[in-house]
Amino acid sequence: MNRHIAGTERKTKNLSHLVIVESPAKAKTIEKYLGKDYSVVASVGHIRDLPKSKLGVDVDNNFEPKYENKKDKAALIKELKKDAKAADIVYLATDPDREGEAISWHLAHVLGISPDAPVRVTFSEITKSGIAAGMSHPRTLDMDLINAQQARRILDRIVGYKLSPFLWKKVRRGLSAGRVQSVAVRLIVDREQEIESFEAQEYWSIDAKLLSASSRRAFPAKLTEVKGEKFKALNKEETDKVLAMLENGEFIITNIKNSTRKKTPAPPFTTSTLQQEASRKLSFNARRTMKAAQELYEGVEIPEMGAVGIITYMRTDSLRISDEAKAAAAQMIESTYGKEYLPSKPRVFKSKNNAQDAHEAIRPTIITLTPEKVKSALSGDQYKLYKLIWERFMASQMENQLLDTKAVDITCGECLFKANGYTVKFDGFTKLYEESKDNDEEEGGALPALEVGEKLKVKELTGNQHFTQPPPRYTEASLIKALEENGIGRPSTYAPTIATILDRHYVEREAKQLKPTSLGIVITDLMKGHFERIVDAKFTAQMESDFDKIEAGKADWVDVLGKFYTGFDKMLTKAEKDMEGKRVKIPDEPTDIVCDKCGKPMVIKIGPYGKFLGCSGFPECKNTKRIVNETGGLCPHCGGKMLAKKSKKGKPFFGCENYKDCNFMTWDTPLEDKCPKCGSTLFKKVGKQGQVYCAKDGCGYVRPADEDKKNEN
């Protein structure tokens, strides 16, 4: 008998137990541990879903879904049925969450397995012990989990299927709206409007650099009070008056407060915090992070161990850690760093109130597998992410950092200055890992030895002008944080949501920042005007809470959908009436480019595939052009201009303008510098230790990239 794993033929063997998982990689890892009496195959995700061509939900009959077998899974379903028929028992071992439970439920339906049969097994980690634990506790399918997934799927289908045609009629075909994506775009649009409407306010500070008798090094101090009131100067005139008061005054230390401050480690990762930290520290987008995490969970080939999952399940909002993992971490910390780095008792981190605590936090499954031990077995992305996860988890179980802090009050007449400094008394967990922040603020360094009553010399006294700053644009990291803090979406939705709003061109990246496009602003304004509840963060969070109640068995999924649909249907009817005969225009961006066909200005438009140049004389003139980003470099093969482009996955690369006749392309950046040997364009290799080289055939010129920096100094 032929069995099928992700389209790959497998050898025939007598089946006793069949285990079905989602992915081929996971199947391969699990089969290694289960032995010859088990065959493990993959469903490759969902095999049944709502139809693509119609709503597929009977809104008048308790929202009954009309599921269909997926057409592209027909051959696989046939193989799964054959395998299931030949097996003594079938286990459904899809992922341990709502989506995984729903996949198992659909598999049971298609394969004729009773939903009351104890065939459902789950693995929080793909290791020998994790698989053994899961296989020893089979259970029936959890209909509360399944109904929570069904409610979310059906609600999202209703919103998307009903709203999208409205947007097509009123704006442009091919647009979409969604329960989570529309709120995410609104957050970005609202932030952009805050930035645009922000009016900077001028203010001034007075800063001193002071010298003590015991030190040559000046230390900084800041004016905080004048005549017993907080110092606040809004212009240069006010600042100059205070500076005049300070001129020739004596700076005397009036108080010194020494204390010890504890700094505690960050908890181990949840899905959200992993995506945020990978964005900040590794410059990974959410999709890239989750791809690498999925691979680490499902299993990688480790020398002398074979395939093994080296992190726990990566879709979680829990901070819980098993006692076994804590004990293993404690042993590793003591043996590697010393007993002083081990706290007196293991740390316990409290999960947020709405966390689903079925899983642990994200952690390494085998603590002794340090990043360096597995580096040779992992891809670059896998290694970087595993190192981040391993170090964060280990640090979370280490002793606090201790800081000796010093706060100094310095008076000059009726003015009070303050200076703050610290020294590290004990490095603690920071020996291994420190959490990054979106906006790091530098703390003061060490202060010299000082005494109360000591007179200080003034090395420098300046008034400095400042302006209040608008709120920053969202990055992927800060957007994920905002979504989580507002209760919008679940751990599994952050990455696909961000990918969707970028792919739909509602949002674009500028460096690491997320900026709304004119299309995104138009759609958001339209949604706010006619579907306020759909783009309201509080309403969306309430829907997530309702799904959680369904999962907990505290709410009926049909009632939840009914309550939503009644209000939504009224909104849609009213919007169609209010917008009858009206269309919304997407504003064009003006350019200095002249149409080569009619002489009118070209403008930047947004189409289904992104931005392009179109003639402002449309529809009389239909001239369009691609937006070309020239680099200043020339192709080493044909001499054409090198253009900056993006792959289908959004990764930047460089290609020749004569791409139809010349196939030269590279990930490496073309420079304006010319090769000193042959005069061709030079390229800089990707990476921190990159080289500058000439790509001209037969030239061979190369130099270290850091030579450029040396020559600048």
Where are these regions (language model features)?
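Alpha-helical scaffold elements adjacent to nucleotide-binding pockets in ATP/GTP-utilizing enzyme cores
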Residues: 29-33, 79, 102-110, 130-134, ...
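Short acidic, hydrophobic short linear motifs in intrinsically disordered regions
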Residues: 253-256, 265-278, 305-314, 470-482
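Intrinsically disordered, low-complexity regulatory segments
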Residues: 1-150, 162, 236, 240, ...
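Core structural elements
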Residues: 152-162, 180, 210, 261-273, ...
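Basic, low-complexity terminal or inter-domain segments flanking catalytic cores
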Residues: 2-17, 29, 38, 164, ...
